[in-house]
C-alpha cells in the first residue's frame, strides 16, 4: 500500500493524540455498549475480559522481543491489527463469535499505542514546535468521542462500530503518510540481540492475574481469588532477583497506576451493585474530563511549584480526593473522580518528564518503561480491591458482595458495606502515598 509521504499537521497530531489518550477506555466503552443487551453473562463479559487483559499483558511483555529501535514500525503494525479488529467488530453483527476475535486484535493492536506515540511525538515536535499545541486539541477530541459513544451506546444500528472503524482507518492513514522509518533511520522495530525473556514471563503473569481477577469480578466465584497471590509472589521474586535500582518516580508510577485503576473500577462496581446503572457512563465521562482539567491545572500549579514538590503535593491531593468516592452523594462521587484523576494525571505528566530524562534506558523505550510499571501498579491495586471486597463481604454479611453486580440484580442494602470497602482501600492508597513522599523521595538522584 503506497501513500504519498507528507509532513504532519496539527490536526493529524491531535487525532493521533486522542487515540493515545483513549486507547484503553474508548475500546472498553465500545465493546461494553455493544454487549449491554446480551442476555448471556458469559457472552457479555468474555470479549471485554479479553480486550482488557490482553492489552495490559502486551504492554508488559512486548519488551521481551528486544530493545525498541523503531517505535514507528510497532505503532504502524499495531494499527493494522486494530483495523482488522474493527472490521471484525462490524462483521460480528452477522456472526457474534467474531466479537471475541475482534477484542483480541484490538487489544493487541492498541496495547503499544501510547508508549510508541510519545517518542514519535517528541521527534515530530523537534522538527516543528508548533505541533505541540495539537496535544490539547487531542484531549478535546477524546472527550467528544466519549460523549458520542455514551449518547449512541443503546442504538441498534452499527453506528458506533462504523465510527470506530473510520477512526482507526483515518489514524492508520495518518501514520502511513508520516515518513517514520526515515526518522528512525530505517531501523528494525526491535534490537533482537537484546531480547529479555523475563518480560514474557511478566506478561504471562499479568495475563493470568487479570483474567482471574476480571473473571472473579464478572462471575463472583470467590475461589478464583486464591489463585492470584501466587502470580504476585513470583513477580516480586523475579524483581528481587533482578536487583533493579528504583527511583522515587518508579514508586510514583506504581502508585498512580493503582489509584487510576481504583477510581474507575471501584466506581463502576459500587454504582452498578447498588442500582445506579446510569452512573457507569458518567464515570467514563468524568475520567475524560479530568484529562483536559489536568492540563489546565498543571500549567497553573507549575508556575508556583516546581519539580518533586509538585508531584508530591499532587500525590497527596489525589489520595485525599479519592475519599469522595465513598460518600453517599452521586455529585460528590463525580467530583471526587474528576479531582482525584486530575491530580493523578499531573503526577503522570511529572513522571513522564523524569522518564524522558532517564539515561538508564534508550529514548525510544522510556515511555514504555513508565507504561509498563503503571500497568503493574494497576494489577496490584485490583488484587487489593477484590481481596478487600471478598474479605469484607465474608466478614460483614457472609455473602459475596459482587453477586448483585454479576447477576444484574442491584441491592441498595450493601451500599454501606461497599463504602466501607472503598474507605479501607482509600486509606491504603493514602498511606502508600505518604510513604512515597516521605521515604521514597530520598532516593532521588542517588
Question: What is the predicted role of each segment?
Answer:
Residues 363-393:
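A late C-terminal transmembrane helix in Major Facilitator Superfamily
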Residues 127-138, 143, 149-263, 430-446:
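Intracellular loop-helix junctions on the cytosolic face of multi-pass helical membrane proteins
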Residues 2-56, 209-225, 244-285:
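Helix-loop boundary and gating motifs at the non-cytosolic
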Residues 98-113, 254, 331-348:
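Hydrophobic core of transmembrane alpha-helices in multi-pass small-molecule transporters
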Residues 54-60, 228-241, 282-304:
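Transmembrane alpha-helices of Major Facilitator/SLC transporters
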Residues 111-126, 267, 345-361:
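Intracellular juxtamembrane helix-capping segments at the cytosolic ends
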Residues 64-80, 301-316:
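Cytoplasmic membrane-interface "Motif A"-like loop-to-helix N-cap segments
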Residues 80-94, 150, 316-331:
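C-terminal ends and interior cores of transmembrane alpha-helices
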